[in-house]
């Protein structure tokens, strides 16, 4: 998968500056959703590929008798409603956003292997959350 930043058009600097305890400036971003199917598809593709590359899904689901959507929802993604799935989903989403910020806004290279190698879908992956190289 070629990682792109096209999905980030909804993430916009709002012009506010906050300051940390040690007086360092912090830019504030807002998630500004607009009804745009192409951007929504870009978000879906971007997050989906963290768990299972589009180029790999058919090989991985072979023999399961599951559709692509069923494979992702039953095997790869954290559960949508059964605990701790929702909190794991939220944490994963936040980590992906921070990784995207580091990579696409600050110019770091951020490896994207954390979720594709998950062995238990409803658990956080052990180890460092995010690492970026400049």
Range-by-range predicted roles:
Residues 1-126, 131-134:
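Mixed-charge (Asp/Glu-Lys/Arg
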